[in-house]
A protein has these predicted regions:
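Conserved phosphate-donor/acceptor-positioning beta-strand/loop module used by diverse small-molecule
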Residues: 44-68, 126
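Beta-sheet entry/capping signal
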Residues: 28-29, 50-54, 106-109
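Acidic-histidine catalytic/liganding microenvironments
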Residues: 34, 48, 103-104
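Hydrophobic/aromatic-lined pockets within catalytic cores
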Residues: 39, 49, 131
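Acidic, metal-coordinating catalytic cores used for nucleic-acid/nucleotide bond scission
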Residues: 35-36, 114-118
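PAPS-dependent sulfotransferases, especially Golgi type II membrane carbohydrate sulfotransferases
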Residues: 1-25, 65-109, 116-182
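Glycine-rich phosphate-binding loop used to anchor ATP phosphates in small-molecule kinases
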Residues: 11-45
């Protein structure tokens, strides 16, 4: 019943707004790229019915290798084991298929590799999906001075680079579980 109560929904929205203020972020639009957001798409839609979900997919082996190398902490222990990564990734794919069947109009799939190859085309798709006006500065995101709180802050301040595409190939001899299961 908590989610049926409009007062509770307002309070939850307000709490999230307070959380965002911790990052000195005052813009009308925000991007929350927390790695586990995919688990909460139904809840996100309930709290923020106008929210758009940009689902950036990537080659599963490259994606899992990236997670493995990042040494995440706090609830992301599945990233420390190839077997756990494979299981988690398959569960993630299943859950995303469910969310897309429930909320097809709020989820846009963008392939990471396509974004790297033709970033202008893919960024324009995102802008259109979000009902925003195109601004050529979107191509120069790395020059934006807005606050960023993410493990990849240094990457976000650089132009798009291609070195992560097919990065798994260099390590495939050490990650046989990922290679065989994904």
């Amino acid at each position: 019943k908590i989610i049926d109560d409009q007062a509770n929904l307002r309070k939850l929205r307000s709490n999230y707004g307070d959380f965002i203020k911790n990052f000195n972020y005052t813009e009308k639009y925000i991007t929350d790229k927390a790695p586990l957001n995919f688990r909460w798409i139904g809840f996100i839609n309930l709290l923020f019915p106008n929210a758009k979900i940009i689902h950036c997919t990537r080659d599963p082996k490259n994606n899992c290798l990236s997670m493995f190398k990042n040494l995440f902490e706090g609830g992301l222990n599945f990233t420390y084991s190839q077997e756990d990564l494979v299981e988690y990734y398959k569960n993630y794919q299943e859950l995303m298929n469910f969310w897309k069947s429930q909320y097809p109009d709020i989820i846009l799939d963008i392939k990471y590799e396509n974004l790297i190859r033709n970033n202008e085309l893919e960024i324009k798709k995102i802008i259109k999906f979000c009902n925003l006006e195109w601004d050529k500065n979107c191509l120069f995101f790395h020059k934006n001075k807005a606050p960023i709180k993410t493990m990849s802050t240094s990457q976000a301040r650089k132009p798009i680079y291609k070195s992560s595409v097919n990065s798994f190939d260099k390590f495939k001899d050490y990650f046989k579980v990922l290679e065989n299961e994904l």
